[in-house]
Every structure is written in structure tokens, then in C-alpha cells.
Amino acid sequence: MSEKSVYCTLFDKNYLDKGLVMMESLVNADQNAFIYVLCMDDTVLDCLTKYNNSHIHTISFSEFMDEELLEIKEERGNAEFCWTCTARLVRVVLEKFKEPICTYVDADLYFYSNPQVLVNEMKKNNCTVQVIPHQFPDTKEGRLQGKLYGLNCVQFNTFTNEQNSLDLLKKWEVACITECSKETVGDQMFTSDWGKYSF
């Protein structure tokens, strides 16, 4: 059997249809896909439990939460709270489930081909973290977009279970817990300085 390709995602009932389509497209594109799903409410957990797909491992909301997150949840909207949880979800997959590598994917993506080509490129270059840049044009307008939306798009990013990767992941997690709003483009703006790291 081939080595599994580990992914994680999160969504609530408002994104359930998109999440199901994303996961179906991912499994069709990468038959080794194994997806950890943080179920942001019981509707998602119940649906995925009934779905009973061997490519999916559910993480219940109650299993994931702690006192800090419960307190933050009261202060943030649904979208902001989902953004808050992204970095921690990746860390949980790496540390609790002992996966060697994990790629976070947004629930509203659709895969037409195997995304492991990106992960394989990362491995080939001996990198431990991969984030996808927006690739705004090097123009006045492009630079303005980078300032407004951040340099990177966090819809698909990969971390290995290595110390420098975990350190950056923890830094991202702390930033998201401190503030995660439209002003920071959710969890996205915090990744803009990642280009200065080389590992």
C-alpha cells in the first residue's frame, strides 16, 4: 500500500456542502488522501459519521476545544473563529496524531489533479514549510493588494513534524489567537513575513 497523503480541513454546517465536494474531489485526485476534519458543529460530525468514509477521520468540536478557545469563541464570529482554529488544527494533527507531514486545505477548494505534486516539490527542495503565494503582479496595484490581503494565500499550506516547522506553526497559532479578524484577513496576514525564513 502507498504512503498516505495527510490533509486537514475544518468547516461548519454552512460549508458542509462545499466540504463534501472538496473532499470527494481530493480523494478522486489523490487516492492516498487521508483527511482529518475538525467538525465545527454537531451537524458536520453527524453527517460525516454517517458518511463513514475510510479516507476521513473526524475530530469533534468538544475534543478539540480548550478553555482558551471557548473564551475566544464567545468574542468572534463564525468565520473569524474558524480562522482562529486553522493553525492549531495542523499542530494537533502533527503532535497528537503523530503524522510526519500535514497539508491544510480550505473547505471550498476543488481538486482537478493530485496536489501531492506540490508537497513532493517541497520535499525535493528539503523544505519543512510550504505556503502558496498570491503572486500579485509587481506593480503599484499588486503591491497594494499584497498589503491589503497579505502575500500568501493560506488555502493550501504544508507543515512537517520537525522543530523549525512546529515553531513557525506555533507562532502562527499564537498570532491567530491574539487577533483574527477582517483587518488581518483572518489567519492570512500573519504569514506575510514567512519569506524571511529559509527551511
List the model feature ranges, each with a label:
Residues 1-199:
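Glycosyltransferase catalytic domains, chiefly GT-A lineage
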